[in-house]
Design a protein with these regions (language model features):
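Residue-level marker for beta-strand->alpha-helix junctions and adjacent short loops that shape enzyme
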Residues: 6, 25, 126, 145, ...
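Conserved N-terminal/central alpha/beta ligand/cofactor-binding core
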Residues: 6-7, 12-118
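Gly/Ser/Thr-rich helix-start
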Residues: 9-13, 17, 138, 162-163, ...
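Helical element adjacent to the flavin cofactor pocket in flavoenzyme catalytic cores
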Residues: 96-154, 190-199
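Glycine-rich loop(s) and the adjacent beta-strand/alpha-helix scaffold that form part
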Residues: 144-147, 151-220
Length: 222
């Protein structure tokens, strides 16, 4: 279910870099690296007060699987240049997709369709359906404004992006003074956060606005 007219989201307007260790690109360049060191270096990106809120177990998991994920992306036709330096990483790990981030959308959309995935655009989820404490589907409004439901055999994945353009959520968790800053993606409304909370989920670290967690258009004032 895609709420916009076409897939893409913030990824579609991003730079498209993918940071990973132990990749084939590093090996070709003669770079000796490890997923363990990658996880250690990642802990130095955020200020200490934010790093204290981080989850080292999740970080190590993602670091450990980053090279395999890059291989998987390339198996679907995506191409990368690099790696290039990205301090405070101690080794060059930034792989940049070519020609740009829209390649992610085009290639993965094609791969999904080949697997029989049906992508409904202008279909906005409005509610998670639950049964005995388990999420079993979603309710959504289609492009005609009609309310429909879809049930799942396995689960529901919330891939809805951040909340940089939801003034209410920002005011609620960050406090006043930030809610009027324009987000770079007008469709980043935190829909997934809202749906999850309505279904009983607990929202964590919603006050963190450092770095890529929330992306804002630069202000003219300094």
């Amino acid at each position: 279910l895609e709420s916009c007219r076409q897939p893409g989201g913030t990824t579609g307007i991003a730079v498209g870099s993918f940071t990973a260790a132990e990749t084939s690109h590093q090996q070709v360049a003669g770079i000796v690296d490890s997923a363990e060191q990658h996880a250690i270096d990642l802990a130095h990106f955020a200020p200490d007060e934010i790093e204290q809120k981080n989850n080292p177990v999740s970080r190590e998991f993602f670091s450990r699987h980053s090279a395999d994920t890059l291989d998987w992306l390339e198996s679907h036709g995506l191409r990368f240049v690099g790696p290039v330096a990205e301090p405070p990483n101690k080794q060059p790990r930034m792989h940049n997709v070519i020609p740009g981030a829209k390649a992610y959308i085009a290639r993965l959309q094609l791969a999904a369709r080949k697997q029989g995935v049906v992508i409904q655009t202008q279909a906005t989820a409005s509610k998670l359906l639950t049964e005995e404490g388990r999420v079993v589907g979603a309710e959504y409004r289609n492009h005609l404004g009609q309310t429909q439901q879809v049930l799942t055999r396995v689960g529901v994945i919330l891939a809805t992006g951040d909340y940089a353009n939801n003034q209410e959520l920002i005011r609620r968790f960050k406090g006043g003074g930030y809610e009027c800053i324009e987000g770079i993606n007008p469709h980043a409304q935190g829909l997934g956060h809202i749906l999850a909370e309505q279904a009983g989920a607990k929202l964590l670290n919603m006050d963190v606005t450092y770095g890529p967690e929330l992306r804002f258009v630069a202000t003219a004032k300094r």
